[in-house]
From Swiss-Prot:
Gene Ontology MF term list: structural constituent of ribosome
Superkingdom field: Archaea
GO annotation, cellular component aspect: cytosol; ribonucleoprotein complex; ribosome
Family, as annotated: Belongs to the eukaryotic ribosomal protein eS17 family.
Record protein name field: Small ribosomal subunit protein eS17
Pfam annotation, one family: Ribosomal_S17e
GO terms (BP aspect): translation
Keywords of the record: Ribonucleoprotein, Ribosomal protein
NCBIfam families documented for this protein: PRK01151.1
Length: 64
């Protein structure tokens, strides 16, 4: 079974992918820095969850 993400994490991730989708990669560390750059998220936990969700979505988009 997979993890269930909160709505605010999904909404933020989809917004980032819609606006800056071409700069995100399959690398979590790179995406973590980009999430910090493009958002005002102060919480480390929320930032990491958004970066992880973006990483998974980018990896799935590249496969198909």
């Amino acid at each position: 079974m997979g993890n269930i993400r909160e709505t605010n994490i999904k909404r933020t991730a989809f917004s980032l992918l819609e606006n800056y989708g071409d700069v995100f990669t399959k690398d979590f560390e790179t995406n973590k820095a980009l999430v910090t750059k493009y958002t005002t998220i102060e919480s480390k936990i929320i930032r990491n969850r958004v970066a992880g969700y973006v990483t998974r979505k980018v990896a799935r988009m590249k496969v198909y």
